[in-house]
From Swiss-Prot:
Residues 834-852 have a biased composition (Polar residues). It is found in: Membrane. The gene is RGSL1. This is Regulator of G-protein signaling protein-like. The keyword Transmembrane applies. It comes from Homo sapiens (Human). It comes from the Eukaryota. Residues 834-854 are annotated as: Disordered. Pfam families: RGS (PF00615). Keywords: Membrane, Transmembrane, Transmembrane helix.
Length: 1076
């Protein structure tokens, strides 16, 4: 028998002896899916019931225990709470013995869940298969921590058949052995370290000193013994309130109406300096007296209600200010890839994600408790699903599964982790569409057609957040009557077991309402139990509040569900405070007081009618004065060259400073500041600094007094979208940067360009246009027609040239010829220039010795060239541009094929992995290379950052490399045009019989080594350019050329053969260097 089966067959009165079991079992019993939520206090062995049983009925604890064993304990054995309790017992038993990774804990829990299932049972076969595939995908992989720490060979385990009886037994034995090894690792290493860490952390907290003293007393006390025996004095707490009829459904609705829905995100932090009383020990008659100015309390009951409302209000304020890590957000526990062999009929296997009911998903009073119940059903062992299964309600079961899968999809969607979520979210969305929304598999679910269509269209993309709450609300409405029937059936069996009565008479005493403070405490207990059950899937570092909370938890008086009302904040008499003290303690109240005082002043002040006019003088500044004001500034020097476009201005430091002063004179410097700020964000590599920079940009340009359109002087629609976004990404800001840059170029660049004298060619073109404008209209029309015809001919010739280029690249030999030409362009000393010691931008003649000693150590001299558009490129990267352009075209072809596959419903995970692999290869080779420089193509830095940001965000479309294609394409066409001209010239001269003076190809590295350093011995050396080399001495073969007249002076000598152990791409593995 497994441990869960042993627990299920043990008498509950024996299990409740254990304080740890009572704590886990109380958490399970308080889940909101159940109607009756009893609570057991270990200290006085007393049960507290909610809803309470009427006073005329006598509740017996033996009947209650029988009902718990029949209706609650079997579901508890199926939950993660039970498996964590078993692991906790293993730890405790190890601690009490004389001896004394998170991933190992996950593996132990998952293996325990698998070993507790009978795989031959047809009803749970799909669930068993899904758990097994999840185990393979997460922990049984080569190189995983579990396999490494357990020192197991998993090949034999992975090759076992799933359904073969003998092999199933073998699998159980192997998993059981691995589980024992993992438990030993946890007990022998992680648990002692955890206890050491716990003692050191709790010793720093003052609230934990009493707990530490008790621990030391028990540790060193020899006479300390555990008090055993059965709790024969077990009892049930008496009822304090009179009610006509017992109904958990009505009690839930009353509680939901009394509790404010805004308190759904309420944190349950305890007082650090006081131990709170559990719900059962809270006295409902206790009064909270609060003195407020100019208010008279009508009665003590009104005082309690108002104080509780304030308590909840300020608890929300404190929770928002503290932002404690214990607050549970939507996070997805899945970070691994799901096996592609998972069948669609298998229910998704997921650890319960930590969910918080957000204010965005607000339900009505009638559906609020159903929303909580459906959240808790999976954590409680699916009792509501089991009820629907007994009634054979297949459609309702499918609706419940859809609700829980949508809840899990929402948690994956809102997860803040980045690695792997895009693929899993896409797969989960496709699976939901295929399993629930596909009309070909079965009948359509009874949801609205608009909701189904919205889910179908937006689930795979992830933009489905508005449709998930709508679909869940429709499902809640349809499951509401069945859930009420489930609660009624629970009430029937509970009363039958506990009181031996099936019906309750309606004759009762006067009705008394339950206080609101009790409902708040009860709601906190229910919410805490749900959060604890969902939090078992994720383990995080505890903050100081959680360590202090451990000190206040007593397993005998509530344990983990020990809750209390948060102490009110700022509930002091504000009339006795000075205004400065009020501003310091409560700024919001101080502002409100100022507003009230001003309102009273306006009401009492005499009204005087007067008119006020504001006369604004208009400044008329001529263009010549603006030029002079700019020229008068001595700090900013006017550049000498006239810029051709705005990109040149932004890339040139001197132009940028002068352009900034130009915009400052015209009060239009804010758009340029935005461009500079976004450029800093795109360069920044630290995520925290990048987030802070983005927040500063949003506060400065989108949350100011003026509208963002006026500040940025741009009317792009994306500005309004960014202003309404909660989370703004870097790629979105880069997109807006392009729009703002275009707006600046349209409004101000022409005026800025007019500050500089035009080029000679521009003057000629302007003169021709002025002369032609004076000619008759017929001549002008003829000229326009001819120029249009010439333009079309040039366009046709350009398209033909590009088509010829693509055909040329398909032939490997011709492609190699083009690459050889690009190598020759490196030696073009007329047009190339180096930028090693030249910062002015003027061309400098390249050095004759390109392969210098510095280059031997890996310092490559970058050769530059100015092409059309006055763009400066690196000639060294021309071949890389050729390959980069080709790889980007191949990626776009993959995107097109993936789109066609998606239309034909043949799109799967392999296509996504293939495209991601292609993107990673392009990134590693050209944009983020391991060999300096990292950027090895002629693409601007901001364009590279935009591509990396798009890859990080998970985009898989043509827009990823669109900007890079537009940057590299002119470079490739420039060299292609020159290559065609060079080839035609060479063919013509060869045809005429003339010699064609070709530039020498780049010389191969002929490195000379001093023979005195190595002699006849082998040498091992390392350079950044060629890596590790093995140099061996060899005899040089005397050639026929050396036997000539000059060979008299040439003596046979040693040469060095260099074998490269780690060759660079494009070089041979081994070669021999010879000297002549």
């Amino acid at each position: 028998m497994s441990s869960a089966e042993i627990i299920g067959s043990t008498n509950l009165i024996i299990l409740l002896e254990d304080e740890v079991f009572a704590d886990f079992f109380n958490t399970f019993l308080s889940l909101p899916v159940f109607g009756q939520t009893p609570f057991y206090t270990v200290e006085n062995s007393q049960w507290s019931l909610w809803p309470e049983i009427p006073c005329n009925l006598i509740a017996k604890y033996k009947g209650l225990l029988t009902w718990l064993e029949k209706c609650r304990l079997p579901f508890f054995c199926k939950t993660n709470l039970c498996f964590h309790y078993i692991l906790c017992q293993e730890f405790i038993s190890f601690i009490k013995s004389p001896e004394g990774g998170e991933e190992l804990v996950d593996f132990w829990i998952l293996a325990e869940n698998i070993l507790s299932i009978d795989e031959m049972d047809l009803e749970v076969r799909d669930y068993y298969l899904s758990l097994l595939l999840m185990l393979r995908a997460t922990h049984l992989q080569e190189g995983s921590r579990v396999v490494t720490l357990c020192n197991m060979n998993i090949k034999s385990l992975l090759n076992l058949s799933i359904w073969h009886p003998n092999q199933s037994t073998t699998r159980r034995e192997i998993l059981s052995h691995m589980q024992k090894v993992a438990l030993f690792k946890l007990q022998s290493y992680w648990l002692p370290n955890f206890y050491t860490h716990t003692k050191m952390t709790m010793a720093k907290e003052e609230a934990c000193h009493g707990l530490m003293q008790e621990y030391e007393t028990r540790l060193y006390s020899v006479c300390y013994t555990h008090i055993g025996g059965l709790p024969l004095n077990m009892s049930i707490k008496k009822c304090h309130h009179f009610q006509k009829r017992y109904s958990s459904r009505k009690a839930k609705r009353k509680m939901w109406q009394l509790v404010d829905p805004d308190s759904w995100s309420l944190e349950m932090d305890l007082k650090p300096d006081a131990i709170g009383m559990p719900l059962q020990e809270t006295c409902p008659q206790e009064k909270v007296v609060i003195q407020m100015p100019s208010l008279k309390m009508a009665s003590s009951k009104e005082t309690r209600i108002s104080s509780l409302e304030k308590d909840m209000h300020y608890a929300k304020i404190s929770s928002m200010e503290n932002k404690a890590k214990s607050h549970l957000h939507m996070e997805a526990p899945f970070e691994t890839k799901v096996s592609t062999h998972l069948r669609t009929v298998i229910p998704i296997v997921n650890h319960s994600s930590k969910m918080t009911i957000q204010k965005a998903i607000k339900q009505s009073f009638s559906l609020g408790y159903i929303h909580l119940a459906l959240c808790a059903d999976a954590c409680a062992g699916n009792p509501f699903r089991d009820h629907l299964k007994k009634l054979n309600l297949k459609v309702e079961i499918q609706l419940l599964d859809l609700w829980q899968d949508l809840q899990h999809f929402l948690s994956v969607l809102l997860n803040n982790k980045k690695n792997g979520n895009a693929i899993f979210r896409h797969l989960l969305g496709d699976r939901i569409c295929e399993l629930y929304l596909n009309e070909q598999i079965g009948p359509c679910l009874p949801l609205k057609s608009q909701t189904i269509q919205g889910l179908k269209e937006l689930l795979p993309s992830g933009d489905v957040i508005p449709w998930i709450p709508k679909a869940q609300k429709e499902i809640c409405k349809m499951l509401s009557p069945w859930y009420d029937e489930f609660l009624d059936e629970e009430d029937y069996w509970f009363l039958l077991f506990t009181t031996q009565n099936r019906f309750i008479s309606s004759r009762q005493h006067k009705r008394e309402f339950i206080g609101k403070e009790e409902n708040i405490l009860l709601y906190k207990r229910i919410q805490q139990s749900l959060e604890l059950s969902q939090a078992l899937a994720d383990m995080k570092e505890m903050d100081y509040r959680q360590w202090r909370k451990i000190a206040t938890e007593d397993l005998k008086q509530g344990g983990s569900l020990q809750v209390e009302l948060t102490s009110p904040v700022f509930l002091t008499d504000i009339t006795k405070m000075s205004f400065e003290e009020l501003c310091y303690k409560n700024p919001k109240m101080a502002i409100q007081k100022i507003s009230d005082d001003y309102k009273i002043y306006c009401e009492k002040a005499p009204k005087i009618d007067f008119k006020m006019e504001i006369i604004k003088e208009t400044k008329t500044v001529s263009r010549s004065n603006r030029k002079m004001s700019l020229l008068k500034r001595t700090l900013v020097r006017k550049p000498s060259m006239r810029p051709r476009n705005l990109t040149e201005v932004l890339l040139n430091t001197q132009h940028l400073e002068f352009f900034r002063e130009f915009l400052k004179e015209r009060k239009a410097k804010i758009p340029l500041q935005f461009l500079t700020a976004v450029q800093k964000i795109s360069i920044e590599t630290n995520e925290k600094i990048c987030k802070s920079l983005i927040e500063n940009v949003i506060k400065t340009f989108f949350q100011g007094q003026l509208s963002p359109e006026e500040m940025l002087q741009c009317d792009a629609p994306i500005i309004k979208e960014i202003a309404s976004m909660r989370h703004v990404t870097t790629s979105t800001l880069l997109t807006l940067q392009g729009h703002v840059m275009k707006s600046i170029e349209e409004k101000w660049f022409k005026d800025y360009q007019d500050l500089f004298p035009p080029h000679h060619q521009e003057v000629e073109v302007q003169s021709e246009v002025q002369i032609s404008s004076r000619k008759p209209s017929k001549i002008v029309s003829t000229y326009l027609q001819e120029s249009q015809k010439k333009g079309w001919m040039r366009m046709i010739s350009f398209i033909r040239s590009f088509c010829k280029y693509r055909r040329f690249m398909l032939n490997p030999s011709k492609r190699q010829e083009f690459e050889d030409y690009l190598h020759q362009e490196m030696q073009n000393s007329k047009e190339n220039f180096t930028t090693a010691h030249n910062t002015s931008g003027r061309s400098a003649p390249p050095s004759t010795n390109v392969r210098s000693a510095d280059q031997e150590n890996g310092e490559i001299t970058l050769v530059k060239r100015r092409i059309f558009g006055h763009r400066i490129i690196t000639v060294n990267f021309a071949i890389n541009d050729l390959y980069f352009f080709s790889e980007m075209e191949k990626f776009n072809d993959l995107v097109s094929s993936a789109h066609m596959l998606q239309v034909n419903r043949a799109y799967n995970e392999n296509d996504v992995i293939l495209m991601r692999s292609k993107m990673n290869i392009i990134q590693k080779l050209f944009l983020n290379s391991d060999i300096p420089p990292k950027l090895r193509v002629n693409v601007p830095e901001f364009q590279k950052d935009a591509i990396l940001a798009a890859i990080t965000e998970g985009y898989l479309d043509r827009s990823v490399f669109h900007g890079a294609i537009m940057s590299v394409f002119p470079v490739v066409m420039y060299f292609w045009k020159r290559f065609c001209f060079w080839k035609a010239t060479r063919s013509y001269l060869q045809y005429r019989g003339k010699k064609f003076k070709d530039r020498k190809s780049p010389p191969k590295s002929t490195d000379k080594y001093p023979f005195s350093s190595g002699g006849d011995n082998a040498i091992l050396r390392f350079t950044l350019l060629r890596g590790i080399e093995w140099l061996q001495p060899q005899r040089e073969a005397i050639s026929s050329v050396q036997n000539s007249s000059s060979s008299k002076l040439t003596q046979p000598r040693l040469v060095v053969s260099a074998m490269q152990l780690h060759p660079v791409q494009g070089q041979k593995l081994s070669y021999i260097k010879k000297e002549k």
